[in-house]
C-alpha cells in the first residue's frame, strides 16, 4: 500500500525474477514503467543485489535508490518481533513464523530438512529429515526480517542454542555419557511434563531411574507428539499406537526430542534430583 507521503510496503519474494519485482513496484505505485526498471536492473546487474524481504519504499526513490533499499541492512526492510514459548514444537514455531510473515511454512520445512547447518550438536545422519532440528530451535524473543530466507531465520534459533550451551553443561553431559541429542530429548520431555520449575529435576531423575531399570517411560507427551490432533488426555487405545515415540510400548528414549525446551529443562536434565523414585506426581 502507499500512504499520503508516497511511502509503501513492498515485498521482494524468494528467488523471483526482476520482472516480478518490477510488477510489485508498479502495482504499489512506486514506479511508473516496469520496462525501464527491468532495463536498469539488467544493465546494472541489480538482480543479484536484490534480497528477498518486505521493504518500506518511497515514490521519491530513483531506480538506483530502490535497488539499494531492497538489500539486507539497508534500513528499509520491515522487521517483526516474535516470541517463541518453551515447549513449542518445530511445527508450531514454523506456523507462527508464517503467521508473522517471516517465511512460509513450506520454505522453513524444506530448509530444516535440506540446508547444511554447521553445528556439531545436529545429527548429520538425519540430513534430509526436518526432525533433525526438533529440540534445537531455542525458545526466545527474536527479531526477524519479514520475507527473509528460511535458512537464515532457522539459523537464528540454532545460533542462540549454541550460545546458551556452556562448557559446564557440555562437561556434565559428558560425565553422564550423553550426547547433546540425548540431553535435549530428555529436556523436551521434561518441558512438556513439568508444570513448574520445582518439578523438573524430579522428572529428570525418574526418567533416568526407569531407563536404568529397563522400564518404559510411559510419558503421555511423547504419544501426543505424533497424534494427528491434540488431546489433553490420552485414551487407552492411544497408548497402544505403533510408533517409536510410544513410550508405553517401547523402552528408552524416543528417537528425537518432542519439543524445543528452555534452559531450565536443559539444566534439570544435567542436574537431576537425588532420588530413585520410579514415578512423579504433577501439580
Regions found by a protein language model. Give the residues of each.
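Signal peptide-directed extracytoplasmic domains
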Residues: 1-164
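Bacterial extracytoplasmic/cell-wall-associated proteins, especially those involved in peptidoglycan
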Residues: 101-103, 117-283
Amino acid at each position: 500500500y502507499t500512504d499520503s507521503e508516497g511511502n509503501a510496503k513492498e515485498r521482494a519474494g524468494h528467488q523471483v525474477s526482476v520482472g516480478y519485482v518490477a510488477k510489485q513496484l508498479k502495482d504499489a505505485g512506486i514506479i511508473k514503467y516496469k520496462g525501464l526498471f527491468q532495463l536498469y536492473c539488467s544493465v546494472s546487474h541489480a538482480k543479484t543485489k536484490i534480497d528477498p524481504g518486505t521493504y518500506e519504499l518511497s515514490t521519491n526513490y530513483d531506480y538506483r535508490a530502490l535497488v539499494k533499499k531492497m538489500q539486507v541492512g539497508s534500513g528499509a526492510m520491515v522487521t517483526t518481533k516474535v516470541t517463541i514459548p518453551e515447549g513449542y514444537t518445530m511445527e508450531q514455531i514454523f506456523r507462527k513464523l508464517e503467521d508473522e510473515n517471516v517465511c512460509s511454512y513450506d520454505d522453513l520445512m524444506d530448509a530444516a530438512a535440506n540446508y547444511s547447518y554447521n553445528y556439531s550438536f545436529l545429527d548429520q545422519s538425519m540430513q534430509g529429515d526436518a526432525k533433525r532440528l526438533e529440540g534445537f530451535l531455542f525458545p526466545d524473543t527474536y527479531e526477524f526480517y519479514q520475507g527473509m530466507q528460511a535458512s537464515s531465520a532457522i539459523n537464528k534459533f540454532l545460533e542462540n542454542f549454541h550460545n546458551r550451551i556452556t562448557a559446564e553443561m557440555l562437561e556434565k553431559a559428558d560425565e553422564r555419557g550423553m550426547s547433546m541429542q540425548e540431553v535435549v530429548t530428555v529436556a523436551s520431555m521434561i518441558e512438556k511434563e513439568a508444570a513448574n520449575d520445582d518439578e523438573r529435576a524430579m522428572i529428570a531423575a525418574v526418567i533416568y531411574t526407569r531407563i536404568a531399570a529397563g522400564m518404559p517411560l510411559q510419558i503421555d507427551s511423547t504419544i501426543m507428539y505424533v497424534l494427528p490432533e491434540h488431546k489433553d488426555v490420552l485414551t487407552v487405545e492411544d497408548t497402544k499406537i505403533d510408533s517409536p515415540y510410544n513410550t508405553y510400548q517401547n523402552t528408552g528414549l524416543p528417537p528425537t526430542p518432542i519439543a524445543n525446551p528452555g534452559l531450565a529443562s536443559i539444566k534439570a536434565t544435567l542436574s537431576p534430583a537425588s532420588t530413585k523414585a520410579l514415578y512423579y506426581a504433577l501439580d
